[in-house]
Each structure stands twice: as C-alpha cells, then as structure tokens.
C-alpha cells in the first residue's frame, strides 16, 4: 500500500536524520549507535523510500559518503579523486546478479576477471606520496575532503615513509589492528583500569587525535586496496600512471589490472593483503567466499565480508562511479553467525544518566571465537516484542561481529517453567522510584541523579575516559571506589579536583567479592604510613592536567544528557565560555549549528539544577579552567 506523500516525506526525513547521526558517531566520535546490519537496513529503506517518491536530494545519505571532516580539529586534505564507499549485497544471489550485469562490459570472447579481497573492519585512510615521499595521510571525511592525520600515521610501522614511485600518488587502504594486538593492549589497559570497546573504535580513536600515543599507533597495521594519481591512466578512482615502470625502481612490467598492480605496490614495500585472489568466473568467487567463511576465525583481524572488483583498470574506467560508490566493485556482507543458548535470567543495570537497561544473562556459549554470557535487551518493549521469557532457549548473534544480540525466543522448546520478566519499579542501586523522563518515553530512569551511587560511579568513569578528561586509572573499579569515598560522601564528582594522594592511599573497598586497595604499595608498612603506588601519583598528575582541558571536553565531563563530542564542540565554538552557556536561553541555544530542540532543552535544563551549578562552581574554584 503506497505511503501518503506526507508520511513518505516524514519517513525520509527520519531515516536521513538516523543515518547522519550514525555516521557522525562512527566517523567522528569513534563509536557505533547501531549494528552494521541495522545501519545497512536504514540505508536500504531510505533508497526504497526515495525511489517511491521519485526524487533524491543531492545531499541525501543515499548519494553521499561518510560525514564532513571536523575542520575545527584537523587541517583539511582534498582528495585527488573522491574517496568513495561501496555498495553492499547480502546474498550470493544478489552478488551473482551484480556479477552478470558487470561482466557485460567485456567483449564477446574476452575473459572478464575479478579480484576478491577481505573486507577488513577498520578505518579508511588515504596516503599521498610526492616523488616517493609521504607528504600527507587523511581520513575519508565526506569523500571529497578528509582530515589531516599525517603526524599520527607516521608512527604506523607498515606505512613506508618512501616508495619507489614517481609523481604524486595516492594509496587508499585500511588501518586496522590484529586481534592478538588488540587483546594485548586491552590486557595492559586492564592493569591501568582502562579498556577499549572494540578494535575498529580503538583504531579510529588512535589516528584521529591531537595527542597521539606512540605505543598504540605502533600496534596498528595497514593494507592498501586502491590507488590514484594526479595524471596518467585513469580508471574510475583507481589510477595508474603509464610511465611508472619506465621511471625505474622496480623492474617488473605492470599491466593495467588491479591484481598485477597490487604486486607492484607490494614490491614498493606498500603492504598488500596476501588473501587477495584473482577469479576468472563466478564459481571461483563463490568458492573463495565459502573458504573464507569457513576459516574466518583463522584470519587474524576482524572482517565483515568480501569485496569483489573487476580486475581491468580500463573496464573500471568504462563502468565509472555514482556519487557514492564505484560500479565496478561491490561488498558482499557476511550474514551474522548465530547460535542457540539458554536465557538464564534478565537483570537490569543503571547507566550514568540514570537510564535503566535490562540485559540477558545467558548460559555461556562460544560464538565467533569468544565466550558470550550477556547481551543487552535495551528496554521492556524489546523484551515484549521478542516474546522473551526467563528460561527460554534463545537464538543469539554478534551484531557487527562485536556486540552480542538476542534475536528471538524459541517457543517450541518451552516446557512451562519459563517466567515472565517485569521491569523493577525501584532503582536497584538507591531505591528511588523509576519513571520515564517524559510522557511517552519507553525507557525508565532513576531520577536520583545526585545521590545514586551507581550513576555517580558511571559519571566518574566517563569523566576519566580518553575522549573526555583522560584521567589515568579512573575506570570502572576505581570510579566505583571514589563514589564510596567516605571523605566526600556522595559528592566525589563535585570534589574531583580536590583528590589527593593521601585520599587514594586510604581507599580500601570490596569489589566483586575481593578487598581492594589499588593505590597502596603491598608489603610491610605501619598503619597510617602506607606508601602510595606510582599509579596514585599518575592519577593525581592527570587530574591536575585535566584542569587545562578545552571547554568542549568539560561540557562532556558534565554528563549532560544527549551531549556528545560533536554537539559539545559546537556549543564551545558558538558561545566561547561556560558562563555564556549557563546563561543561554533555549532560543539562543537553538541558534547553535547542528543543535536540535531536544539537545537545547537538555542543556538549558541541566544548568537550572542548583547542585549542577554547584558542581561547575566548585570545579572552577578548585582550578578547572573550562578552556580559558
């Protein structure tokens, strides 16, 4: 049944907003608002809706790539040719249709070959070389203009500072981290009470920062998957200068094909994936995909599909590109692996903003190479929509290869012992009555933001995170400890910049069944004369450094609901001072670029609460500069 025009317009507007928000989170904030499957479904629905309407705005996400570069943080880099995305297919039938359509460009009797490559779950990077020297590295950005990350990429060991290729040459590729390296860093981070959510976000955070960590950057790898040049032989964004071999450096004759070009790049010390394969027919492509699927866990880094490209550069040029993706390449996305386990219980957690989220306690089971024992259930509506009962057998998968997700219950396996879950009416931490923040909200929240210790611990952990005030050792366990610090009662957040080494040494608390005193040296000591660990000094030093953080990071540290890095930077750029933001009226906040009504009201209301104003004033009196 067709949509009325008004409904279709509203649906397109909503889908566009959701996709742009997801892109901002993914490309600028190094996080994910949804799984790859959910994102792909939104893009597919938007294309269908625009097709039904018979019109696409030229700025629609269906026709654009990535998100605009954050030029207030990074210098702009204009790509020689657009750094495009890829169209996706989700079944072998869809891939075969693309294959048949694409190979029609090959003349009768001329063999049409394809290159198959792993689709690595990393961050797209463009490297520019001038007469053999690396002169810049850039992110994708919006496809036309990226962010200059040269200083960070110089630390990546697999990226050569010089290559034996003349002229101005751009190498397109993927920056990523191998699983064992990521696990090693997370183990070290665990010892420092800091861990990273997933490999892709780790890489994005490392290369998109103004304060690079050399050790982290040295753990990153890079594989080339394309190239482009200012002049010479052009092929739909993957170019090759016809005089390259005549210029010396490498003797191998290069043909105008992707696969042979990769060999040439490899000889020039540019890393190329050894899993790349040349296929002469669809049967070979299908066999390659099946072999990778069966041996996926043997691949030492996260992948989420296979990229299939036509090999001939000349034929790539003939096929060309849309504004978003080349016509000569496509990404086949792996279906998420799933398995069945038992839903042992449903429990709830309280977040730093008071949101109460149910999660599934599962019978532990191996899935995609790791043990899964928990999965988020989002809210009571999701539990009802999926018809979940405690005791059910459920099918689970890892959304985007990372986050465990409960897909559905298996009601045919029920024996009558299953129990209906009901959301609690009281906060499991402080006992406050749970309620929606406004009429019609699905989520329940604990309104006791000032005194709920779990919320306080969550806010402290967030304040200490790398993207906010970056306070060493202020992660989950120590945030929990500080929230229970007797000296400050329930005001550890307010008194954060007063914390001393003596306060840390005095910390002794029970955490997950174990007595902990993380800032006190082990061994002989007299009561009242315990020696602090080096980590205690590091934490106090980083608290002192945090006082000089930019205004936008302090806005994040205030834990204002709906405020992320992009909106915090927009507020800081527009108003320039914390005083101006505190005193701003809603209509003034609405003038800020990219701020909608929900965020404007949230910011306005936050500063109307007396204890929050006290928080800001106390931090300022304790030396926090708020960007000044």
From Swiss-Prot:
Zn(2+) binds at residues 427, 430, 446, 452. One of its GO terms (molecular function) is DNA ligase (NAD+) activity. Its cofactor is Mg(2+); Mn(2+). It comes from the Bacteria. GO terms for biological process: DNA repair; DNA replication. The keyword Mitochondrion does not apply. DNA ligase that catalyzes the formation of phosphodiester linkages between 5'-phosphoryl and 3'-hydroxyl groups in double-stranded DNA using NAD as a coenzyme and as the energy source for the reaction. It is essential for DNA replication and repair of damaged DNA. Belongs to the NAD-dependent DNA ligase family. LigA subfamily. This is DNA ligase. It comes from Tropheryma whipplei (strain Twist) (Whipple's bacillus). The gene is ligA.
